[in-house]
Every structure is written in C-alpha cells, then in structure tokens.
Regions:
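Short, basic interhelical loop/turn and adjoining N-cap
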Residues: 1-9
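Charge-patterned, long linear interaction tracts outside catalytic cores
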Residues: 181-208
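Helix-centered, glycine/charged polyanion-binding patches within enzymatic domains
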Residues: 108, 113-180
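Polybasic low-complexity intrinsically disordered regions
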Residues: 11-15, 19-127, 135-136
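Electropositive phosphate-/nucleotide-binding environments in soluble metabolic enzymes
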Residues: 90, 160, 189, 193
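A general structural signal for well-ordered alpha-helical segments in protein cores
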Residues: 93-96, 167, 192
Length: 208
C-alpha cells in the first residue's frame, strides 16, 4: 500500500504552500460575496519551548506567547471570510485594510470601539458599506450625532457579538492553541481551523 507521511513531513509541506492558496481555499468555503460582516480579533495560545531551552536562556518560568488572529466573519452564514495571522503584538487597526481588500462586503461592517476611526468610516462609505462601529466613550455629542445621522444603530450593533461566538466555536471544535513555532507553521495551522469550520457549516447546509 501507500506509505503514510510522517508528522514532520506534513509540517514541512504545509510551510511550502503559499499564502494565496490558503486564502483561495478559505474563500471557496465561505463564498465570494457577503452582506453583513463583523471584524474582530482573538488569540491562540502557543505551546511553550522545551525545559532545556528555558533553562538555557535562564528563565525560571515558561515563556508566555500567543498568536493573534484578525478576521472578517459573515454574521448570516457564520463563516470566516478572511483572516490575518500574526505572532507579535499588533493593534487591531493594523490589519483592517488587508482584510477589506480581500473581501467583497455588500451591506454592513460591524466593529467594536477598537475599530472606531474616521478613516475607516470614510473608507466604508467609499466602498458603499454601512459601518456599524461602536463610537468611543469620549466622543463629542456633535460627532455622535453625525455618526447616528449616517446610519449607526445600537440595535444593529449587537450583531457584532456573533463573531465572538464564531471564535468560541472555532476554539471548541479545533482547539484554542497552536503547536507551530514560527509564523510560517502557525499560519497554515490557523487557516486549516477556519477552513474546517466553514466546511462543517457547509455540510450542515447541504444535508439539512
């Protein structure tokens, strides 16, 4: 029969797969166009290095680190539309343009106060997207009136919480940690989780 590749061989192979292929696979499982999309980020814990490595660098405790996932999430189909993975701390706004460039949103973008920026709202208006982004607490009454006049609704905003449910479902089904040591191995690992999540929902759609 056929020889089964070892785990290390599979890990080496996934590193060689270019990013555009992972993006294409994710899009094929999520669809091409999305009406209402939420944006947010979450963290995946990373396995600690070996005891000998920790001892060699004179550390008494394990090294705390995590991988950050920023994502766009279709609140209607509950699927992940686009993702960005980082292994170093970054502000949520760093990956917004990257994600929006890879996603065709037809109606609404939901986001929490971490995404409250004038340039992002203007970008959404240019793309004919309605931004439902919660304003910061220190916003002036005048600016708040402007935002409300342009379509912001507290009732609609609550749909943003669906992306948090999506992150929770992703971690429950496929684990909240990653075993890769660098971004080249962590990226495909998280992409696989998101793709598997989308496929499981697609299977439910087909057979129900």
């Amino acid at each position: 029969g056929l020889a089964v590749p070892t785990y290390s061989a599979l890990c080496k192979m996934r590193k060689r797969i270019p990013l555009w292929i992972w993006e294409k696979l994710l899009k094929l499982t999520a669809g091409m166009k999305y009406k209402q999309v939420a944006i947010d980020g979450t963290g995946f814990s990373r396995t600690n290095p070996s005891y000998h490595y920790i001892k060699r660098i004179d550390r008494r405790e394990p090294v705390k680190s995590y991988a950050k996932l920023s994502a766009l999430f279709d609140v209607e189909t509950k699927k992940f539309c686009a993702v960005r993975i980082r292994t170093k701390p970054r502000h949520d706004m760093q990956d917004v343009k990257y994600l929006l460039k890879r996603t065709e949103i037809q109606q609404t973008l939901f986001g929490d106060t971490g995404y409250d920026a004038k340039w992002l709202r203007e970008l959404c208006y240019q793309k004919k997207i309605q931004p439902i982004i919660k304003p910061r607490k220190n916003i002036t009454k005048r600016n708040m009136r402007k935002i409300i006049a342009r379509g912001y609704s507290e009732e609609k905003y609550h749909q943003r919480s669906l992306i948090e449910s999506g992150f929770g479902s992703l971690k429950r089904k496929y684990g909240g940690s990653v075993s890769g040591k660098g971004v080249a191995s962590i990226r495909p690992e998280i992409y696989c989780k998101a793709i598997a999540h989308n496929i499981s929902l697609r299977r439910i759609e087909i057979f129900n």
